[in-house]
Amino acid sequence: PLAMPLASLLWVSVLLGQPQPQPLCTTAEVFLRDDRRMAAIVEPDTVDDWRTRKRVAGCRVTAAGGTTRGVQAEAVGFYERVRAVGWVRTPEPRDAPSEGSLRFRSGPADCLFNVYGAAMLNTDAEMLAEDRRPLVAGETRYHVYVMCLPVMPAAPRDSTPPRPR
């Protein structure tokens, strides 16, 4: 009689130890792996959402790739390609274009993409992505970090408090 509950508990512990699918990040992950030929690591995430002023369950993708044209040119080409494959800018995107971050929408997800050069997050995911995508001769390392949240309407223009000066 005790064997069945114990077996069930063991099965649950195995399932909990497995990476869980992150459907909000699926399109971004596939794009990074298949189109951009990057190694991509997907993880669950909780993000402070400016639209709702709440913590929202989402996911993140940490990817590593190589470029022969330099990181800045790669970033420009990257965002052109994001648009070409069907991602659209989110309504009233609040992103950081001077920092290389742009927010796009595809299907059920609003995702903030950030393109950068050398490793700077110092996370296990960043190191694992680099290990999975070695550079070949003539390539320079670049990374993409993506945070995805469920699609939501844009916040009213007066809903965000002004930034302190």
Feature names for model-found ranges:
Residues 3-15:
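Sec-dependent N-terminal signal peptides
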Residues 16-165:
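An acidic-aromatic pocket/loop used at catalytic or ligand-binding sites
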